[in-house]
Amino acid sequence: MRLFDGMTIENGELNISGVGVSELKAQYGTPLYVYDENMLVNQCRTFINNFRSSKFNTEVLYASKAFSCLEVLRIASREGLGVDVVSLGEIHTAYKAGYNMKKAYFHGNNKTREELQYALEVGVGTIVIDNDYEYEMINEIVTESGNTVDVLLRINTGIDAHTHEYIKTAKDDSKFGYSVYDEKIYDLIADINNQSNLNFVGFHSHIGSQIFEKTSFFEAVKVVMEFTKKVQERLGLTISVLNLGGGFGVYYTEEDRPFELAEFLREYIEVVERESDNFGLDLTKVVIEPGRSLTCNAGSTLYSVGGVKKTFAGREYVFVDGGMADNPRYALYKAKYEAMLANKMNEEEDTTYTVAGKCCESGDMLVMDAKLPKAEQGDLLLVSSTGAYNYSMSSNYNRLPKLPVVFVKDGSSRLVVKGETLEDLIRQDI
């Protein structure tokens, strides 16, 4: 069990940035998403301060699919990050959060006409082209509007990032982008470059998520730059922007071995600079897109324990008042987490429990084989590292209301997303 910066133990109770879990339950109830605001800000600054170059401009985008709400986007914007958006809703949220939309990059493999029109309306700065159909539609919409927009082409490097199959994105048969080994890509690039309303500036690449091997990132840089050099030589173009995506691995359990982030970012930029020189490129900007690595460890989910049960087969369960509706990642990926009884932090962890949710679903598990003190009804159980792809992937399965989100900082807390009510559950029903 790992306590992150900002987590302390006071009289046997877990505090997050100076706020006790019992106080959080009393004020907001459970289940509850809790984020350490200082940790969010520090992660933003780690990326901004260490991914820097004297040879070209650098830009850090927040991949908002990890966790999107007005307040987290306000923080990212204040800290100088751009934003990666993938839907009408993410564009709208960033816009309403006050983002400079010129710093927004619109991704996705199936952008709709409505989404593209809205993106242009609010001034999204860059659109990332994913496929032929999308390219034709973007060109048509931009031409009709009389606007111009910067575009990147998403490419696949074929790099095998050693991660879960569902979050690999650079395989040759991935649904995203174009393979750099497909000869047809050169004709496409030439055609895009000839469009007067599309300002073709470069390429986007992303090899996957939750990657712990530095060499995967470094190899991808080399492949992208080698391809960029070929494009420039064959087509007589100058490529000015490379977006290298994200995928930086984070800690969930002791099985994970994330690299030290600041050190990696400095090493990463050195590799980018060196390979750019090796291939004779004249880049003006290099972009990265962290999401999970910005928010994951800053967030936790606080639950109340209901029942405790030992089965005939000997498995002991702790039942909590949330589950797969607020965290579907175990059901999707068999994702692993750490749990703690946050009101019994000084007691011996001498019992092995399976932490299960309240959904009417046999797969509604949160943590398998968690070592905890003896659990009782009314205990507070905290699952850590839920700050990415929990709130954003949550659902109303079993007609459960979505959870509130609270930010804590220096001994105080504030509500940033209201929890849903029963009336919210039927608001759209007819």
Language-model segments: what does each one mean?
Residues 1-150, 186, 190, 194-199, ...:
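A charged N-terminal "starter" segment
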Residues 7, 14, 176-178, 355, ...:
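Short clusters of hydrophobic/aromatic residues that line enzyme substrate/ligand-binding pockets
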Residues 66-68, 89-90, 110-112, 131-133, ...:
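Active-site-proximal loop/turn and secondary-structure-junction residues that shape catalytic pockets
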Residues 73, 96, 116-121, 138-141, ...:
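Short acidic, glycine/serine/threonine-rich loops at helix termini
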Residues 154, 174-183, 309-317:
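Acidic, His- and aromatic-enriched active-site or binding-groove loops in soluble protein domains
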Residues 273, 281-430:
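Charged (often Lys/Glu-rich) extended helix/loop segments that serve as interaction or gating elements
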